[in-house]
From Swiss-Prot:
Its job: Catalyzes the attachment of valine to tRNA(Val). As ValRS can inadvertently accommodate and process structurally similar amino acids such as threonine, to avoid such errors, it has a 'posttransfer' editing activity that hydrolyzes mischarged Thr-tRNA(Val) in a tRNA-dependent manner.
Underlying gene: valS
Transmembrane residue ranges: none
Gene3D superfamilies: HUPs, Isoleucyl-tRNA Synthetase, Domain 1, Valyl-tRNA synthetase, C-terminal domain, Valyl/Leucyl/Isoleucyl-tRNA synthetase, editing domain
Subunit structure: Monomer.
Primary location group: cytoplasm
Species, as recorded: Dechloromonas aromatica (strain RCB)
GO biological process: one example: valyl-tRNA aminoacylation
Entry's EC annotation: 6.1.1.9
UniProt-recorded name of the protein: Valine--tRNA ligase
Xref: Pfam families: Anticodon_1, tRNA-synt_1, Val_tRNA-synt_C
PANTHER family the record matches: VALINE--TRNA LIGASE, CHLOROPLASTIC_MITOCHONDRIAL 2, VALYL-TRNA SYNTHETASES
Length: 943
C-alpha cells in the first residue's frame, strides 16, 4: 500500500475510529489467566454537556495509560459513563420550559421528569461522540449513566445501609442556599469573587444604658437575626462588658456579649455581631456557646416573620437599604466605609448564595460506624498506610487537610431531577428509610404505624452517586454471593489509577475513598494522579465571560474567525461583553484557528502534563506537534521508498555469513547506535509511564523521532544505502524499518491515529504484523543487551565533527548550495570510516585526510578533540577582512548598548527580572561571538 504524499488527519481519523470500535478492540479483558489487570474510571462528565479543554486533557492522559497497558498485555478496562448532573440538567430544561411560558410546577414532577429524560436522550450523546473524536478507547459497551436502573439500586442500597448504621441522618443545619433555584448547593457550585461593597459601623447600646459597642458588618440586614455580640477574651477594652446584655437596634430583643478567641483583636473595633442562622463562622460560634438560631429569611430570600413587622416581605437587598436608613435616622450608624469583599455566588445562577438554616439529610463524617471507626478515619488510614498513593505526593497534604477539618456532608437537594431520597414520612413525622414503598410500609407496620406514607421529595446531591462510581459501574449488588461471582469486581476493584484535577480532590476523590471503603471494605483505586487545570496562554481560567474558551473539536477540525466569534459571544450571561470578546478574538485569531488534527492536539496535551496547579495552553505547540506528525509521516515515506521490494534478510539475526542460504547481513556502527538509542528511550518511556510523567514521555518520544531518527539516522542511512556493499545495505534497510516499526508502537498511546495508519504498511515489511491493529501489538520494551556504548560514543564523535563542519560554513558565510573539500588532520582510522557520512552531512565535495593543515591557509580551523578541520576554499582576503571588521564593529556597538542598559539604575529598578536576564544573556552571546571573530581578523593581517 502506497502512503499518501501528505498527512491528512481527518481522513485517517474517520476511517480508523469506527474500525476500532466495530472490532471491539476496546472491550474489557476478563482473561483470568492473565496476572495483570489495569482499570481506570472516566470521571463522568455531565450527560448533556459538551467537551471542553479540561476534558480533552484529562481524557488524553487516561487513554494513553489505557492503550499502554493494553499493549503491555494486561486485562484492561477503561470504564466510561456520564453523570446526570442534577442542578445543571434541571436548569437547562427549566430554561427551555420558561421560553414556552411554562414552569416545572405547571407540569408537575412526573411530567417534568419525562421532559428531562427526553432532553437527556436528545443531547446525551454529544459528549461521548466528541470523546470518540479525541481517539479515546473506553469499553463503550459498558457505558453507564448515574441514573441507570442498576446504579439507582446501588444508590438506594448505600443510603439504606448508612441510615441503618446511624451514619445518615436528617437535621437542621446551615447550608449554601441558592434562592433562585430554591435548593442547597455544594461548595463547588459556589464562586467566591472579590466585589466592591461597604462596611457599616453600627453602635449597639448596652441594655442598662451605661455604655455601647460599635460592630462592623458588610450585611446590616442580618442584624435582625443577631443573637450575640462577641469580643476576644483577652481584649482589655471589653473585658468588663463580657456577660452583659446589649439592646439589639431596630428590635425589642436583648442579646449577650460573649467572649470567643475567634475574634481578631486587630480587625475593626474588635467587636463582632453573631448571626448563627446566616453565617457559617457564626454558626460554629453559636454551637460552641449554645446561642439560639434565628433565621430571618424565607427560602426565596425575603424577610420572614422572625424580623420586626416593618421589614417582613422585603427582598434581602431592599431590607438592607431599609435597615441602613433606619439606623441613620436613629443616629447609631457611626460610619460607612467602602470595602472589598468576597461575595459567594451560584455558579449557574450568579445570585448571591445565602447561608440558610434548613432541614436536610447529612452523612455523618466523624461518627464511628459499627466497626468503631468513622468514615473519615478510614479514608485517612488508607492514604496514611500507603494503600492509596498520590502522584505528585504533595497532594496528600491537601487530602489530609480537608479530611481533618471535615463537616458532615449535606446530601439532599431541593430538586426533582436526581436520585429521590428513599425515605417516607408518616403523618406524625416518623421517618421510614427503605428500598421501596412496600418495604417502608412493612417497616412502618412493624413500628405500629398504619397510616399513609409520603415520600421525601428531595433528591440526593449528584456527588453522592458519583462517590459510588468505582463499584456501582462494576455491577456491584450488595449480595455477597452474586458479587463474589462477578469477575469484573474481582479484577477491577480497586482500579489502578484515578486521573483527576486537584479541584475535586475533596468533592469526588475523598468521597469515593470514603464510600467505597465503607460499603465494600475495599479501596476504590491504588493510585491518584492529580493534574493541574488548563488555563489560557496567559494563565487565566478559561470561561465564557472572559471570552477565552477553546473547543478541542475546533482545534482538531479548525474554525473560521466569524464562526469562532459567534461561538464565543452566543449565550453570554452579560451580552454587553460580546463586543470586547469579538475584538479580543479578532486580535488573537485574525484568520480563525487552523486544523491540527487529533494526534497533534493529544501530543500537545501530553507535553503540557507537568506537575503543578496551572497548565498554560499554548496553541503554538499544536502547530509544532502537527509539524512533528508531518515529520513522522515523511520519514515513513522515505523508509518505505528505500526498503519496499528489497531483501531485508529478516530471517538472519547476526553480522556474518549466511545461515541456511539467507543473504548476509552487516550492521554498521550507526545501525547499532540507533538500536541502542531505541532501547534507552524505551526504558525512559516505561519509567515515565510508571511515574505518570506524560510531559517527559512526549519529550522523550519527540526527541528520539525528530532528533535521533529523522535528523541523524535517516541521513546516515541514506549514505549507507548509496555507498555500502549488499550486506551493509541490508543492515541499514532492516534497521530503518525495524526501528520505525518499534517507534510507531512506542508513540501509539499518545498519537493513535497516525501510528495505526503507518503501522499497517510498515509492520508487514518489518516482519512484525502480529495483530490486526497496532493497539493490540506488544508495547516495545528495552533489551539491555542491545545497548552499545561504543557505537554511541562513535556517533557522538561523528556528530561533533558534523557540527564543526557546519559551524565553519556559517563562520565563512558559505552558501549551502556550494560544495567544497574539507581538510581533516588527526583522528586516525575513524576519520576514514566517517568520511562518506561526513561528506553528505557537511555538504562537501570530498573529505581529504591530511597530515597537517597548510601553513599559509587563511581559512578558520575547527578543533574536535585531536582532530582539526578546515574548509578548503579560496577566500578574497580583502573582502573577508572588511566583512569581519564590520561584524566586529556591529557586535561591539550592541555590547555597549546592552551594557549601558544594565548600568542604568532606573532600568534595572523598573524592568522585570526576565528582561534583565535577557540583556545579560545578550552581552554574553555577543561577547562569545566577538571572541571568535577577532582571532580570525588578526589571522588575515592588516590591510
Amino acid at each position: 500500500m502506497e502512503l499518501a504524499k501528505a498527512f491528512e488527519p481527518a481522513d485517517i481519523e474517520r476511517r480508523w475510529y469506527p474500525e476500532w470500535e466495530t472490532q471491539n478492540y476496546f472491550a474489557a479483558g476478563v482473561d483470568a489467566s492473565k496476572a495483570d489487570n489495569f482499570c481506570i474510571l472516566l470521571p463522568p462528565p455531565n450527560v448533556t454537556g459538551t467537551l471542553h479543554m479540561g476534558h480533552g486533557f484529562n481524557q488524553t492522559i487516561m487513554d494513553a495509560l489505557t492503550r499502554y497497558y493494553r499493549m503491555r498485555g494486561h486485562n484492561t478496562l477503561w470504564q466510561p459513563g456520564t453523570d446526570h448532573a442534577g442542578i445543571a440538567t434541571q436548569i437547562v430544561v427549566e430554561r427551555q420550559l420558561d421560553a414556552q411560558g411554562i414552569s416545572r410546577h405547571d407540569l408537575g414532577r412526573e411530567k417534568f421528569l419525562e421532559k428531562v429524560w427526553e432532553w437527556k436522550e436528545y443531547s446525551g450523546n454529544t459528549i461521548t461522540k466528541q470523546m470518540r473524536r479525541m481517539g479515546t478507547s473506553p469499553d463503550w459497551k459498558r457505558e453507564r449513566f448515574t441514573m441507570d436502573a442498576g446504579l439507582n439500586k446501588v444508590v438506594t442500597e448505600t443510603f439504606v445501609r448508612l441510615f441503618n448504621e446511624g451514619l445518615i441522618y436528617r437535621g437542621k443545619r446551615l447550608v449554601n442556599w441558592d434562592p433562585k433555584l430554591n435548593t442547597a448547593v455544594s461548595d463547588l457550585e459556589v464562586v467566591q469573587e472579590e466585589e466592591d461593597g461597604f462596611m457599616w459601623h453600627i453602635r449597639y447600646p448596652l441594655a442598662d444604658g451605661s455604655d455601647s459597642l460599635v460592630v462592623a458588618t458588610t450585611r446590616p440586614e442580618t442584624m435582625l437575626g443577631d443573637t450575640a455580640v462577641m469580643v476576644h477574651p483577652e481584649d482589655e477594652r471589653y473585658k468588663h462588658m463580657i456577660g452583659q446584655m446589649v439592646k439589639l437596634p431596630l428590635t425589642d430583643r436583648e442579646i449577650p456579649i460573649i467572649a470567643d478567641s475567634y475574634v481578631d483583636l486587630e480587625f475593626g473595633t474588635g467587636c463582632v455581631k453573631v448571626t448563627p442562622a446566616h453565617d457559617f463562622n457564626d454558626y460554629a460560634v453559636g454551637q460552641r456557646h449554645g446561642l439560639p438560631m434565628i433565621s430571618i429569611l424565607t427560602l426565596d430570600a425575603k424577610v420572614n416573620e422572625n424580623a420586626p413587622e416593618k421589614y417582613r416581605g422585603l427582598d434581602r437587598f431592599d431590607a438592607r437599604k431599609a435597615v441602613v436608613a433606619d439606623l441613620e435616622a436613629l443616629g447609631i450608624l457611626e460610619k460607612t466605609d467602602k470595602h472589598k469583599l468576597k461575595v459567594p455566588r451560584g455558579d449557574r445562577t450568579n445570585v448571591v448564595i445565602e447561608p440558610m438554616l434548613t432541614d436536610q439529610w447529612f452523612v455523618a463524617m466523624s461518627k464511628p460506624g459499627d466497626d468503631g471507626k468513622s468514615i473519615t478515619e478510614k479514608a485517612l488510614d488508607v492514604v496514611h498506610s500507603g494503600e492509596i498513593k498520590f502522584y505528585p505526593e504533595n497532594w496528600v497534604n491537601t487530602y489530609n487537610q480537608w479530611l481533618n477539618n471535615i463537616q458532615d456532608w449535606c446530601i439532599s437537594r431541593q430538586l426533582w431531577w436526581g436520585h429521590q431520597i428513599p425515605a417516607w414520612y408518616g403523618d406524625n413525622g416518623q421517618i421510614f428509610v427503605a428500598h421501596s414503598e412496600a418495604e417502608a410500609k412493612a417497616e412502618a407496620a412493624k413500628q405500629g404505624y398504619t397510616g399513609t406514607l409520603k415520600r421525601d421529595e428531595d433528591v440526593l446531591d449528584t456527588w453522592f452517586s458519583s462517590a459510588l462510581w468505582p463499584f456501582s459501574t462494576l455491577d456491584w449488588t450488595g449480595d455477597e454471593a452474586i458479587d463474589a461471582a462477578n469477575p469484573l469486581l474481582k479484577q477491577y476493584l480497586p482500579s489502578s489509577v484515578l486521573v483527576t484535577g486537584f479541584d475535586i480532590i475533596f468533592f469526588w476523590v475523598a468521597r469515593m475513598v470514603m464510600m467505597t471503603k465503607q460499603i465494600t471494605g475495599q479501596i476504590p483505586f491504588k493510585h491518584v494522579y492529580v493534574h493541574g487545570l488548563i488555563r489560557d496562554g496567559e494563565g487565566q481560567k478559561m470561561s465564557k465571560s472572559k471570552g477565552n474558551v477553546l473547543d478541542p473539536i475546533d482545534l482538531i477540525d479548525g474554525i473560521g474567525l466569524e464562526a469562532l466569534i459567534e461561538k464565543r459571544t452566543t449565550g453570554l450571561m452579560n451580552p454587553k461583553q460580546a463586543e470586547s470578546i469579538a475584538k479580543k478574538t479578532k486580535k488573537e485569531f485574525p484568520e480563525g484557528i487552523a486544523s491540527f488534527g487529533t494526534d497533534a492536539l493529544r501530543f500537545t496535551f501530553a507535553s503540557l502534563a507537568s506537575p503543578g496547579r496551572d497548565i498554560k495552553f499554548d496553541l503554538n505547540r499544536c502547530d509544532g506537534y502537527r509539524n512533528f506528525c508531518n515529520k513522522l509521516w515523511n520519514a515513513t515515506r522515505f523508509v518505505l521508498m528505500n526498503v519496499e521490494g528489497h531483501d531485508l534478510a529478516l530471517e538472519h539475526q547476526q553480522n556474518g555469513p549466511a545461515c541456511g542460504g539467507s543473504a548476509p547481513l552487516e550492521f554498521s556502527f550507526a545501525d547499532r547506535w540507533i538500536v541502542s538509542q531505541l532501547q534507552r528511550v524505551e526504558q525512559e518511556v516505561e519509567q515515565h509511564f510508571t511515574d505518570y510523567r506524560f510531559d517527559l514521555i512526549a519529550q522523550a518520544i519527540y526527541k528520539f523521532i525528530w532528533d535521533e531518527f529523522c535528523d541523524w539516522y535517516l541521513e546516515i542511512a541514506k549514505v549507507e544505502i548509496q555507498t555500502g556493499n549488499d550486506a551493509q545495505q541490508r543492515g541499514a534497510r532492516r534497521t530503518l524499518v525495524r526501528t520505525l516499526e518499534a517507534v510507531l508502537r512506542l508513540a501509539h498511546p499518545l498519537i493513535p491515529f497516525i501510528t495505526e495508519e503507518l503501522w499497517q504498511t510498515v509492520a508487514p515489511i518489518a516482519g512484525r504484523k502480529t495483530h490486526d491493529s497496532i493497539m493490540l501489538a506488544a508495547y516495545p520494551r528495552a533489551e539491555e543487551y542491545k545497548i552499545d556504548a561504543a557505537s554511541e560514543a562513535k556517533v557522538e564523535r561523528l556528530k561533533a565533527l558534523a557540527y564543526a563542519c557546519r559551524n565553519l560554513r556559517g563562520e565563512m558565510n558559505v552558501s549551502p548550495a556550494l560544495r567544497m573539500p574539507l581538510l581533516v588532520a588527526g583522528g586516525g582510522a575513524e576519520i576514514s570510516e566517517f568520511a562518506a557520512i561526513l561528506q553528505a552531512l557537511g555538504k562537501l565535495s570530498e573529505v581529504q585526510i591530511v597530515d597537517d593543515m597548510p601553513a599559509d591557509a587563511m581559512a578558520p580551523v575547527a578543533v574536535v578533540g585531536e582532530t582539526r578541520l578546515m574548509l578548503k576554499v579560496e577566500i578574497d582576503v580583502a573582502a573577508e577582512r572588511i566583512r569581519l571588521a564590520k561584524e566586529i564593529e556591529k557586535l561591539e556597538k550592541q555590547i555597549s548598548i546592552a551594557q549601558g542598559k544594565l548600568a542604568n539604575e532606573g532600568f534595572v529598578a523598573r524592568a522585570p527580572a526576565a528582561v534583565i536576564d535577557q540583556e545579560k544573556q545578550r552581552v554574553a552571546d555577543f561577547t562569545a561571538t566577538l571572541e571568535q571573530l577577532k582571532p580570525q581578523l588578526a589571522k588575515l593581517g592588516q590591510a
